[in-house]
C-alpha cells in the first residue's frame, strides 16, 4: 500500500502569510508552500492565499491544526492527505521561468537555459523553504527599482535585510553590484542563499549569515529590506544608521494604506531620509496585471525608495 502523507492547509489574508508560515514551521512543519488564486487552489477567496504545510506524521499535523485554532483570531485549518510520492515535486509545476525585470529572467534549476535575448540575465533560483521566488509583488517591485538604478548600483556593495532565498542580493549582483551582504533572522535559510549563489557562480561575491540589522557595524551605499510595514517602522533608525551618506534604501512589503505612515517615519528621523520615489504594483486596481502577481484583497503593494543625506553614492568610474 502506498504511503499517505499529511498536510495542513489554511486560508489566510495575504499580508499575514509570512507570519503564519513562520508559525507553521514553529509547529513542526517540514515545508510550507504558498498558493494563491493563480495556482488554482480551491477555497482561497480574493485577497487570500492558501498555505499548505507538510508534516512528518498525522499526529503532528493534528496538533498543528489544534494550535492554529487557538490563535487570536482562530485559524480554521484542515487536514489533507496525498497518496504516494508524486507530491514531492508537484509544486514545481507552478514555478516556471518568468521575467522578473526587463533584464532579468528567473529560471528554476530544473528548467535551466541560456539567455534568449540581448541584454537578458538569467537568475537560477530554487527557494527551498525560504521566502522569495520573485513571483510576489513585494519582491518584484524591489528588483525593478534595482534594475532602474543599475548605473548607481554598479560597482557598489549592498546589504539585503531579511534575505529569504537571497533573490534580491543575487539580482543586485547580476546588475553589477560588486558585493552583497545578506542577513536573515532565520538561520535555516542561509544554506538556501548560498546554494542559489553557487548555482549562478556568485558564491565569491556574497556573504550570507543569520543575524539582524541591529548587529551590523558598518555602512552600505545600498540597503534593501523586503519585510513587513509593522517591522519596517520600528527598524527605521537602524536601517538609516547602516546607510552611507548619499546611500539608497528600498523598502517593500508595504500595502498602499501603509505607505504614507512609512514615508513620514523615515523622513522625520533625526537624520531624515529623502523620499525619492514610490513604485506601485501594476497588479493593483487600475494597473496592468502581470502573470504571477497577486493583490491583497483589492489593495496593492508598493515599494519605497529613499536616499540618505550627504555625499553622492554614484557609480564609480
UniProtKB/Swiss-Prot annotation:
<dbReference type="InterPro" id="IPR029063">
    <property type="entry name" value="SAM-dependent_MTases_sf"/>
</dbReference>
<keyword id="KW-0949">S-adenosyl-L-methionine</keyword>
<dbReference type="GO" id="GO:0016279">
    <property type="term" value="F:protein-lysine N-methyltransferase activity"/>
</dbReference>
<comment type="function">
    <text>Methylates ribosomal protein L11.</text>
</comment>
<dbReference type="InterPro" id="IPR004498">
    <property type="entry name" value="Ribosomal_PrmA_MeTrfase"/>
</dbReference>
<feature type="binding site">
    <location>
        <position position="162"/>
    </location>
    <ligand>
        <name>S-adenosyl-L-methionine</name>
    </ligand>
</feature>
<dbReference type="Pfam" id="PF06325">
    <property type="entry name" value="PrmA"/>
</dbReference>
<dbReference type="InterPro" id="IPR050078">
    <property type="entry name" value="Ribosomal_L11_MeTrfase_PrmA"/>
</dbReference>
<protein>
    <recommendedName>
        <fullName>Ribosomal protein L11 methyltransferase</fullName>
        <ecNumber>2.1.1.-</ecNumber>
    </recommendedName>
</protein>
<keyword id="KW-0963">Cytoplasm</keyword>
<dbReference type="GO" id="GO:0005737">
    <property type="term" value="C:cytoplasm"/>
</dbReference>
<dbReference type="GO" id="GO:0032259">
    <property type="term" value="P:methylation"/>
</dbReference>
<comment type="similarity">
    <text>Belongs to the methyltransferase superfamily. PrmA family.</text>
</comment>
<keyword id="KW-0489">Methyltransferase</keyword>
<feature type="binding site">
    <location>
        <position position="226"/>
    </location>
    <ligand>
        <name>S-adenosyl-L-methionine</name>
    </ligand>
</feature>
<feature type="region of interest" description="Disordered">
    <location>
        <begin position="274"/>
        <end position="297"/>
    </location>
</feature>
<feature type="binding site">
    <location>
        <position position="184"/>
    </location>
    <ligand>
        <name>S-adenosyl-L-methionine</name>
    </ligand>
</feature>
<keyword id="KW-0808">Transferase</keyword>
<feature type="binding site">
    <location>
        <position position="139"/>
    </location>
    <ligand>
        <name>S-adenosyl-L-methionine</name>
    </ligand>
</feature>
